[in-house]
A protein has these predicted regions:
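Tryptophan (W) side chains
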Residues: 3-4
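N-terminal acidic, glycine/proline-rich low-complexity segments
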Residues: 33-352
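Hydrophobic alpha-helical segments and their boundary regions
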Residues: 17-18, 153
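Intrinsic disorder/low-complexity segments
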Residues: 15-16, 33
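Bacterial Sec-dependent signal peptides at the C-terminal "C-region" and cleavage site
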Residues: 26-34
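Sec-dependent N-terminal signal peptides
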Residues: 18-27
Length: 352
């Protein structure tokens, strides 16, 4: 090439060439690693809406670096008669994703291989709550959380989305403090960001006191408020609810290959106008999805994942329900947009 010849005769040009190559490599590295890093804690195995959210996540897998899919205690507290984790439900969805991945690759780049995702499916603690955090309570899931957080940096934090309980995250934090002390804990919490759906293990306030400094969005109404008015319920309540109907799901999701065929058509929560699509956990990862419009550095800004207010303690909470303002609308207002995009991506899962 001409620049190699010029470099022999003009040393300054050779240095310029080296600098240019370095810049290209840096730009390529940024492009390769610019996607949000994501770890999911899911109580999959209770209300089928976790399976719904996981299926949707699979057709957005190219938009993230999915670093962990942790099956925490199945169901919400008291929902099931037994204590169990169900990572096999995640594996079934990833298997179906692997079947449609060749089709997805025709439309976008960056889809992880199913085998790569299998290696990131972990099991957490089948028990939940404060009594199961501490010595002897480490799990495959809590250890994996530590590993993923440690692998990152403050400038590129891990997004931890909690679809179920927080027990495995709390155990990871307890272990880090136990092994590394307060300074090590402070370094650790600076490298992740949390969006918690519902405070299902009822330990959020305890966690804030025990492990200060976390970036933490808590999707939970104020004490005594109607829990149906929580931001994340805008995924299926309010706005154009025809977009959550069985008819819409059959036409746009379940008919689109083996991944869509797994999409459950009945969920457990009432009220739900169609008792079909719920996906109450989806706003947690919508918030970190670049095309969803949210500003991670300022959760008060609008986007698919909702809007939040900063509290005096430094965490983020739902906007209050007032006359003329429903916090669910901060999600439901975007339903035509995010359902249109979901339908498009599901259409990629089949040959045309």
């Amino acid at each position: 090439m001409l620049w190699w010849k010029l470099g022999r005769h003009f040393p300054d040009f050779a240095a310029m060439k080296h600098l240019l190559l370095l810049m290209i490599l840096c730009i390529s590295s940024v492009q390769a690693t610019g996607r949000p890093r994501l770890l999911v804690l899911t109580d999959i195995g209770g209300d089928p809406d976790d399976q719904q959210s996981m299926i949707r996540l699979m057709v957005y897998a190219n938009e993230f670096e999915i670093e962990g899919l942790v099956a925490s205690s199945a169901g919400t507290m008291g929902e099931l008669k037994y204590e169990v984790t169900k990572p096999e439900l995640i594996r079934a969805i990833v298997t179906a994703y692997g079947g449609v991945r060749p089709h997805l690759m025709k439309h976008r780049e960056g889809w992880p291989e199913a085998e790569w995702l299998f290696g990131r499916i972990k099991s957490g603690n089948p028990k939940r709550g404060r009594d199961f955090i501490g010595d002897g309570q480490d799990t495959e899931g809590s250890r994996w959380i530590i590993k993923c957080v440690d692998a990152g940096m403050k400038e590129r934090p891990l997004a931890i989305t909690i679809w179920g309980g927080q027990t495995d995250l709390a155990q990871a934090l307890w272990r880090v403090r136990e092994d590394r002390g307060g300074g090590g804990l402070a370094e650790f919490v600076a490298k992740f960001q949390v969006y918690d759906i519902g405070d299902q293990d009822k330990i959020a306030d305890w966690m804030f006191a025990e492990f200060p400094g976390m970036y933490y969005i808590l999707g939970r109404p104020e004490e005594g408020a109607d829990r149906r008015l929580t931001t994340y319920r805008g995924m299926y309540l309010g706005g154009d609810e025809s977009l959550t109907s069985r008819k819409w799901i059959d036409e746009n999701v379940r008919s689109k290959g083996p991944l869509g065929a797994l999409y459950p058509v009945e969920t457990w929560t009432a009220p739900n106008p169609h008792a079909c699509m719920k996906e109450g956990d989806t706003p947690s990862w919508f918030f970190f999805l670049p095309l969803g419009g949210n500003k991670v550095e300022d959760p008060s800004k609008p986007g698919w994942g909702g809007q939040f207010r900063r509290t005096a303690e430094g965490r983020y909470r739902d906007l209050p329900f007032t006359e003329g303002r429903d916090p669910r609308e901060t999600v439901s207002r975007w339903r035509p947009e995010f359902q249109k995009d979901f339908a498009l991506r599901m259409s990629w899962c089949v040959d045309r």
